[in-house]
């Protein structure tokens, strides 16, 4: 076989030799394609698998960790929550609407493949600067695609984040998280047990869309990528809705042994993963696969990533009942093969063997690389900058208004108003707060959901940035009163074959692992997205954390908005002169430099525990974490959310701009009734947390004084205008 054939599929010379050694012969074209997709970074995790072992994955409440379609955690009363996050970065860069739409469809299938009813979607998005017309095109397409698929499915998109940085200009990030609820007795896994059992394909017909989508997602983007539009799948959310209902009915009737979504690598991945988990094999006749296009080759059928398809292994005798259920939902259900006991994936076409490969060779024997790691030279340059010598602002009101208008901090209502976040009627707190809250019907419980990440911090210090991503997600849950349970992560990085990127990846995972250990948030699964890189360079290293938390009593929840005149403002935690990597530094000084804020995880843990206790006791009327933009922006956001101003008096030796815009970690702003003040301060003392009364809610302006000097007095109207109109105005250009 000519080297350019397997190289074009993404295999190296050494990997091709390993394939030959496993088979004892040269692979044919179909077999080569199967190895290429399953040994891609997207499916095989060959550059990340050894590093991912750093993550803590076990806890008494974790029912399913990494290795399945999605993670599962116990929430009591025989119920569990199923959740996972994945990326659809490369497809969205080429075809933003369909790339993002099918990102939603794929992650939702992972949820109901476990037997759970999907209940919510979240997303984490990264684009280039909004003054660029292509960025506006990409953002419009991505948001439209997410809205289209989620709204048509009848799933609320309840939370998310959107950031804009030059490093994402050519390579946007589209990370989508889905969440489901399940009775623990209904949990199913993707396994193909029982020799002789049928293998059924249900759902959509198979076409040529998405062929080699997995290998496309395992290479750098270039001008030639525009020609890869056939690698972008096309989604049909209405068919997926039918598929959800049919699959859940099949599970409720206990008709199957296992079920797997046909995502990346299509029939190839779903079949070999199910067989490998069970230690079995499969014989599949691709002539039986329903097709929507004529003349498809065995290679195309095996590698197609056509959407809205599931692979099932029914219990013996259940095949006709499954067909009847699918007919009722307007879906095809076809037996395409059977489970075998020889461990081989035997692919037939009308009685002819077109591929024969050991199932575990495709999964367990994927090469694992220990990539060379090297600290990037740029870190010395960006950290040498003496930020204490920056000029102080003359007009602090102008600075705050400018920060509120900065796209990273401005209202994202332009985005989330396109999503139906109230559908299903379980959304108690939707977009715009620190975390979304969904009720668990029939109980007093609530689920709290968030996604968080900061690529700028990770660019300056990936270990600290990774830890902060976990800490901030948990802090956001604490602000609504929820205890964090576990995380799913989406790790977005450049080319791992470059030592600097491999170093960033290792450092970020190390930091995340450290935070997960201290905060007791095990990792239940996720996704690694490498090769987010173009000729102009790599993206910022961007680990994104999706976190699920539990509210034992949904009535004891908190929001970010100031609600009552006369309530006192208490700042939990301490402020240090930490503006490295801050929004203030980037927006007003044009710099991405310095070190990101320090993170003391034990202090973080104490602050979060304190705030949860205060909220559970009914002592807080508002809670908001101090994150990007610092204390000043947190105050403005809470004032705008509640439609109520505040007067704040700070006493400090810090420079005013550092005090107001520092992004020091482990800080939460609380509003409490005056009569609750002493009890809250006593609780803080007991937990060793610094708590300072800094002001009072009231009026229609935000007034901030430092050491008796008024820094700004801004009306809610002028702040709201800057904050709300920024992104709509930019998108309308």
Curated annotation (Swiss-Prot):
Binding of substrate, residues: 87-90, 109, 233, 305-307, 529
GO biological process: 'de novo' IMP biosynthetic process
CDD domains per the UniProt record, alphabetical: PurL_repeat1 (cd02203), PurL_repeat2 (cd02204)
SUPFAM superfamilies in UniProt: PurM C-terminal domain-like, PurM N-terminal domain-like
Active-site residue numbers: 42, 88
Signal peptide stretch: none
Positions that bind ATP: 45, 84, 489, 526
Pathway(s) served: Purine metabolism; IMP biosynthesis via de novo pathway; 5-amino-1-(5-phospho-D-ribosyl)imidazole from N(2)-formyl-N(1)-(5-phospho-D-ribosyl)glycinamide: step 1/2
Keyword rRNA processing applies: no
Main location: cytoplasm
Reactions this protein catalyses: N(2)-formyl-N(1)-(5-phospho-beta-D-ribosyl)glycinamide + L-glutamine + ATP + H2O = 2-formamido-N(1)-(5-O-phospho-beta-D-ribosyl)acetamidine + L-glutamate + ADP + phosphate + H(+)
Keywords: ATP-binding, Cytoplasm, Ligase, Magnesium, Metal-binding, Nucleotide-binding, Purine biosynthesis
Residues annotated to bind Mg(2+) 1: 86, 527
E.C. number: 6.3.5.3
GO cellular component terms given for this protein: cytoplasm
Subcellular location: Cytoplasm
Annotated residues for binding of Mg(2+) 2: 110, 261
Protein purpose: Part of the phosphoribosylformylglycinamidine synthase complex involved in the purines biosynthetic pathway. Catalyzes the ATP-dependent conversion of formylglycinamide ribonucleotide (FGAR) and glutamine to yield formylglycinamidine ribonucleotide (FGAM) and glutamate. The FGAM synthase complex is composed of three subunits. PurQ produces an ammonia molecule by converting glutamine to glutamate. PurL transfers the ammonia molecule to FGAR to form FGAM in an ATP-dependent manner.
Self-association and partners: Monomer. Part of the FGAM synthase complex composed of 1 PurL, 1 PurQ and 2 PurS subunits.
Protein family membership: Belongs to the FGAMS family.
Annotated protein name in UniProt: Phosphoribosylformylglycinamidine synthase subunit PurL
Source species: Moorella thermoacetica (strain ATCC 39073 / JCM 9320)
């Amino acid at each position: 076989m000519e080297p350019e054939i397997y190289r074009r599929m993404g295999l190296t010379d050494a990997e091709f030799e390993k394939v030959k050694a496993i088979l004892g012969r040269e692979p044919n074209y179909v077999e080569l394609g199967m190895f290429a997709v399953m040994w891609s970074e997207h499916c095989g995790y060959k550059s990340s698998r050894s590093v991912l072992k750093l993550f803590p994955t076990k806890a008494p409440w974790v029912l399913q960790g990494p290795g399945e379609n999605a993670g599962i955690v116990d929430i009591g009363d025989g119920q569990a929550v199923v959740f996972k996050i994945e990326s659809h970065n490369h497809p969205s860069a080429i075809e933003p609407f369909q790339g993002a739409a099918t990102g939603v469809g794929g992650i939702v299938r992972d949820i109901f493949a476990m037997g759970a009813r999907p209940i919510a979607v979240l997303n984490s998005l990264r684009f280039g600067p909004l003054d660029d017309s292509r960025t506006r095109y990409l953002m419009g397409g991505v948001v439209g695609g997410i809205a289209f698929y989620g709204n048509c499915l009848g799933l609320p998109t309840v939370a998310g984040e959107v950031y804009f940085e030059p490093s994402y200009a050519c390579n946007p990030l589209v990370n989508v998280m889905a969440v489901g609820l399940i009775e623990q007795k209904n949990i199913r896994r993707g396994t193909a047990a029982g020799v002789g059992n049928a293998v059924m394909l249900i759902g959509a017909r198979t076409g040529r869309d998405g062929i080699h989508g997995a290998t496309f997602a395992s290479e750098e983007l270039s001008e030639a990528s525009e020609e890869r539009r056939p690698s972008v799948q096309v989604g049909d959310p209405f068919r997926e809705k039918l598929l959800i209902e049919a699959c859940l009915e099949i599970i409720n009737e206990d008709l199957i042994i296992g079920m797997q979504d046909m995502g990346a690598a299509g029939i190839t991945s779903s079949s070999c993963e199910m067989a490998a988990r069970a230690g079995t094999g499969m014989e599949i006749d691709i002539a039986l696969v329903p097709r929507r296009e004529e003349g498809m080759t065995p290679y195309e059928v095996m590698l197609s990533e056509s959407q809205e398809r599931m692979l099932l292994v029914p219990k013996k005798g259940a095949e006709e009942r499954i067909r009847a259920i699918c007919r009722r939902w307007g879906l095809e259900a076809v037996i395409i093969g059977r489970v075998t006991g020889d461990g081989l994936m035997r692919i037939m076409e009308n009685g002819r063997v077109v591929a024969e490969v050991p199932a575990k060779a495709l999964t367990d024997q994927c090469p694992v690389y220990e990539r060379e790691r090297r600290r990037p030279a740029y870190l010395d340059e960006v950290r040498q900058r003496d930020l204490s010598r920056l000029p102080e602002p003359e007009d602090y009101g102008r600075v705050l208004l400018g920060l509120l208008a900065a796209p990273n901090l401005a209202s994202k209502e332009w985005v989330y108003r396109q999503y139906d976040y109230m559908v299903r009627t379980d959304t108690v707190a939707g977009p715009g707060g620190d975390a979304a809250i969904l009720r668990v019907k029939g109980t007093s419980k609530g689920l709290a959901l968030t996604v968080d990440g900061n690529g700028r911090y990770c660019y300056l210090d990936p270990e600290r940035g990774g830890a902060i991503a976990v800490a901030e997600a948990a802090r956001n849950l604490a602000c609504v009163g929820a205890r964090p349970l576990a995380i799913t992560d989406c790790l977005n990085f450049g080319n791992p074959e470059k030592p600097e990127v491999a170093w960033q990846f290792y450092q970020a995972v190390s930091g995340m692992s450290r935070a997960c250990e201290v905060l007791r948030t095990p990792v239940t699964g996720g996704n690694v997205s490498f090769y987010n890189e173009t000729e102009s360079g790599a993206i910022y290293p961007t680990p994104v954390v999706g976190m699920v938390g539990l509210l034992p009593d949904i009535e004891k929840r908190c929001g970010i908005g100031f609600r009552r005149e006369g309530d006192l403002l208490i700042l939990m935690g301490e402020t240090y002169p930490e503006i490295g990597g801050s929004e203030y530094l980037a927006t007003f000084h044009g710099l991405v430099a310095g070190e990101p804020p320090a993170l003391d995880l034990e202090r973080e843990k104490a602050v979060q525990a304190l705030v949860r206790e205060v909220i559970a006791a009914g002592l807080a009327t508002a809670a908001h974490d101090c994150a990007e933009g610092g204390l000043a922006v947190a105050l403005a956001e809470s004032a705008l959310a509640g439609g109520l101003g505040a007067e704040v008096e700070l006493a400090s030796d810090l420079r005013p701009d550092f005090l107001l815009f520092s992004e020091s970690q482990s800080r939460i702003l609380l509003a409490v009734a005056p009569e609750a003040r002493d009890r809250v301060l006593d609780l803080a003392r007991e937990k060793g947390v610094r708590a300072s009364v800094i002001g009072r809610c009231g009026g229609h302006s935000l007034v901030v004084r430092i050491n008796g000097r008024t820094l700004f007095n801004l009306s809610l109207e002028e702040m709201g205008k800057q904050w709300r109109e920024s992104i709509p105005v930019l998108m309308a250009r």
